[in-house]
């Protein structure tokens, strides 16, 4: 940090009212010469008044400000320093700009250093997000409650931990020991009274949020470990496993509604829109597969991509589907035309693991490099950095108000990011040029600050002062 001193700081401490009565160009006749101090020391008088620095300062009575006496003053000060053993070294200045310590003349109304002001302002800002959560085990998935300030967290030990959060603290409300192996996915239903979880033990558990009791379970829901899950309606949800099998479930039925196997690799993401007609899934073998829910059969399957398709998001009032990949690429599909993409955007080089839509055009993505980025996806642009982890971002979710994002990585922590500032964000036009600086630009939610943003206020203050 550079040391920025206010121009008024020196004047407020160096003004001597006695010097204003004569012209600095002429030497005052009544100034005491240095040799007089040597012959007639006034130490006794100084000792009597020494206790009150504010009423009396020897330098104010005998100090010299004329440039003609600088050499004599230096000699006098060095002699005094030898006689007094260097105790008055602080008062041996050759000019009248620093007669006292800064703290002696400090005034709260005086203009402070602008850098210090900026730091104090940041410290005094009220918290706009909950504190980080440090967990004992790896976090595999998390999900916000649809109405309450609750966050469900799945861990590698098979537990589902429910946290209640505020801007001041995060407390554990309940711990559900539901699975014998690592949790893969956890979701609240639309009403928020049920908590559904899947795990590597191939089971699906439905837990009552209020009582913590098990409401329903499927022990051997899949032949392979369940990889992902998505709520469809109040009573239905879909699951996909490591072997490429998709199943649609109804909480009121014992057996799955239907089962399909259209891919050979793991199903990474499942999504639908408000109409609930098409169910889309991405897989590790590079396919986007669309299922017609009413007909319970495959609608269309895309051309294969030479990369894993990892995440999806619906934008532009359900008219666009954007798919992220393990190579950091984004493919845009017109809704209903899922055979091949209509647009492509090359994003960061790191693979994309998660995508959370926050507006009709903007999403927050989490990647292998541990960075959460804001992406304007229709058209494709990087807007900046929302937050960061030290390891790859594995899971993310957005709360019901759309103001808070929670994310986690393999460093055993959950971090929150306030993204309310996107409410006033302008849309990007198609003919606008991409900004390369946006790749490393920190947005207000980031834990890191842009140096240009920090000092921009200082530059503005200096230019304003020069204009005055």
Curated annotation (Swiss-Prot):
Gene3D superfamilies referenced in this protein's UniProt entry, alphabetically: YVTN repeat-like/Quinoprotein amine dehydrogenase
Keywords: Repeat, WD repeat
Region Disordered: start-end pairs: 1-107
InterPro entries the UniProt entry points to: WD40/YVTN_repeat-like_dom_sf, WD40_repeat_CS, WD40_repeat_dom_sf, WD40_rpt, WDR55_POC1
PROSITE patterns, A to Z: WD_REPEATS_1 (PS00678), WD_REPEATS_2 (PS50082), WD_REPEATS_REGION (PS50294)
Compositional bias of kind Acidic residues: 15-26, 41-58, 67-91
WD repeats: 134-173, 178-217, 221-259, 262-301, 304-343, 388-427
Keyword presence, 4Fe-4S: no
Top-level lineage group: Eukaryota
Recorded family membership: Belongs to the WD repeat WDR55 family.
PANTHER family: WD REPEAT-CONTAINING PROTEIN 55 (PTHR44019:SF20)
Protein name per Swiss-Prot or TrEMBL: WD repeat-containing protein 55 homolog
Lineage of source species: Eukaryota, Metazoa, Ecdysozoa, Arthropoda, Hexapoda
